[in-house]
Structures are given as structure tokens and as C-alpha cells.
């Protein structure tokens, strides 16, 4: 049994986390500014304390004394039209709130040994088709700057010996709250569809997996630094819209033009149109297992739980045995140049990626061939790279999507 503090405990993610901690037998101190607290927090010790306020550090330090870990989720919601005052609250609630929590932990005599702080996919800004592992540099738009300041404050805890994890969360999917809850009425009415071009990458994670990853971060000493809290099932906004429409058995063809989104939502619209091809590299390396890895199954679980329905999938499976030593086979098939050897000359296969090509996890390759004189281009991502053993590549663009 552990003693865990959770800030932002009355939010939909915080409430789910507190419920999971209590269910496994942990003691929980739930911090909230007050208001209508969910009944499920009843077995937690409630501290009515605004951790984003000036002067809260002494009271906060007293409450954190003797805890094993703190999960910091408090912060102003980014949803809605952004006024200058709203943007200031978004920034200050994260920077000041995190600073207060870190200062309070530092003031403890026997303080927490682990600190898990929320961050967001906005850290990367809009990056089109660039694969984004935790090593990628930050973006330079408003939310990216907020996340940089947020994580900088959080990582101060590591300077005095507290194991610190920053979870860069994608779109957290739940039926009762968050972005998906706002989308559901529109899609149920049959007027939902892609936003803008729909080609932007939308990193996402089921609420249950988001909470499970927080528990994983609390429990595993090897987990530290930035962690992309997203599903490995990479998806564009257009595919997300199609999958949601299928889960609801409703059409999903009503595009929302970028200009219209900008007029209605202002600067906030850019967060919906931004593209982040986030890879959960660190979580995979640490051995985290997703319960809801597939987008189609995750959406069915949320909108139609217990139905037993399965998403409609067309699967083509093929295998081939090569009678040669594995290192030799790996060397041949992992070299993209050899794709030309395997492709009929009439298709005029070409590699567009500049050479030399360093094959590795996260590597992106561009190809072109011609079919009856028409050029076809596609793009693949090396999703897994285990030298001399195996590799997995995923098509991002091309004729099979």
C-alpha cells in the first residue's frame, strides 16, 4: 500500500486516477479547489486547497509530508475560445501550480520519492508528418511554450533527488468528459466529420490506459523524464472521424473547414488542426502494455460498452520462409535499396529519401513507383527496430490506406 497525493483530483482524469488508486488499496490525499466533488472521492482524504494560488506552499508541504508519490494534474482547461486572460490562466495555472508543488515537496522532511506531472502533446507544436519521440525538440507556438515552462518547473524536483516523470498526454478519450464527450453529440446527430483537411495526426489514449500509465509511472523506478502518453495506433483526424462514425453507426462525412473553425473558436482552433505524429517510444521500451491499443476497439468500448461488437477490419496476411541465417535475411530485407531488387522493373521503383539512410526506430522513408505511367508515392515509418532480429514498418501515406 502506498500513500499518494493527487492534485486536480476533481477533474475527469484525476477522478479516474483516484478511483484506480483506491481500488488497488492505496491511501489517497485528493487536492481540489472545492465545488461539487465526485462521490467516488469519498474514501480519499480531501484537501480543499488551490495549489495554483500564491502562498499555498506551507499548507501544501504539510499535506505532502510522508507521501510516497504525488501526481500533479491541476491546471486551467485549454478548451474554449482563448482570450488574453484565458491564455494567461492556462500558462500561470500550470507554471505556478507546478512550482508550488515542487517547492512544497522540497520543504518536506520526509517527502515524496516520485513525482508524476501531467504535460501535453502540445509540447511539440504542429509538426506535420515528423515522427515525434520523447527526444524531439519542442515547438514554438503558445501551447508548446506553456508545456516547456510546465516541464521545466516539474523537472526541478529531479534536482533534489525526486524521480520525476512528465506525461505528455494526447487526446484522452472518455464518454463523460474531455474532447470526445463534446464531439459525441455532433457525431450522433450524423453531422460529424474531419476537421480541416483531416490529414493532421491526432495522438490519443483511452482514459483507462492514461490512468494505467500514471500507475506504471508511480510504481516503476526506471520510468523517469518525458513519456509520450499516447496509443501506438497512429491515426489522422480523418481516420478518427471515420472510426467514431462507425462506432456510433452514423455517417461522418461533414467536413468542418479550417476557416469556419477559426471564426468560431479563434486561436484555439489551431490545437484541433495541429499535427503531432507522436510515438510512445519510452513507454514501449519500459514494457508498458496498453489495454486499448486499437482506436476502433477503444471507441467501441467507450460509446457501446459490453455490446460485443467488433470493428469491421479487412486483414491481409502473408508469410514467407527464407532458408538462410537470420542475420543475413535481416541485412537484406532491412536495406530499403533491396526493395528495388524485389520490385518489377516496369514499376520504376525509386527511393526519394536522401541517402545515406540511417535505419533506426522512428526513421521515415519516402518512395515512388509508376503504375501505367501514373506516379504513386507512399511514406513508411519504422515503428520497431531490433537489429539482427526484426523490424516493423508502418505505412503513413500510400495506396494501401
Task: Enumerate the predicted regions with their spans.
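N-terminal Rossmann NAD(P)H-binding glycine-rich loop of SDR-like oxidoreductase domains
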Residues: 4-24
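NAD(P)H-binding glycine-rich loop region in Rossmannoid oxidoreductase-like domains
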Residues: 40-97
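Conserved Rossmann-fold NAD(P)-dependent oxidoreductase catalytic core, especially the SDR/UDP-sugar
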Residues: 82-87, 99-141
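Conserved beta-loop-beta element that borders a ligand/cofactor-binding pocket
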Residues: 119, 152-175
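Glycine/proline-rich active-site loop of Rossmann-fold NAD(P)-dependent oxidoreductases
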Residues: 148, 162, 173-182, 217-227
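Alpha-helical substrate-binding/gating segment
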Residues: 184-192, 200-234
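Mid/C-terminal beta-alpha module of Rossmann-like enzyme folds, strongest
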Residues: 213, 220-267, 300-310
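Hydrophobic ligand-binding cavity/cleft-lining segments
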Residues: 278, 304-360
